[in-house]
Amino acid sequence: MKKIFATLAIAVFASSVFAASVSASEITGDSSGTSSVSETEECVLANSTDVYHFTAKAGEETMVMVIGDGDTDLDLYIYDENDNLIDKDVDSDDTPICTWTPKWTGKFTIKIKNLGSVRNYYTMWVY
């Protein structure tokens, strides 16, 4: 419960601090096509991974935050354009958060992995 409240507080704070960190006007996702930079609502199937791609600017702190529906554990992974793992949140919950500062402007990949046996509806924010 504490993490949910902390996540919501971070979302409110981050919307004012990190809103300009992503340079792309859209995030492209393998699961649903195209969606808004600031907020994406989606469903990841049981034991599956949703994948998104976006461009982030060098030197600007970037945050990806996911809040699931509470049914399963969601893990979050961030990769750079060379497929190097940049950050991950693999806690046993469905509210993962990753924050990093890119060393160069480039393409990044977001992977949201559902470890459960049922689907999970989630909202993702990129700041």
Report residues per predicted region:
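Acidic, Ser/Thr/Pro-rich low-complexity intrinsically disordered segments
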Residues: C43-Y121, W125-Y127
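Hydrophobic transmembrane signal anchors and adjacent membrane-proximal interface regions, especially
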Residues: T7, V22-S25, M65
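Positively charged n-region of N-terminal signal peptides that target proteins for export
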Residues: M1-T7
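Bacterial N-terminal signal peptides
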Residues: L8-S16
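Transition segment at domain starts
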Residues: A20-T49
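Intrinsic low-complexity, intrinsically disordered segments enriched in polar/basic residues
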Residues: V17, S35-S36, T72, Y122
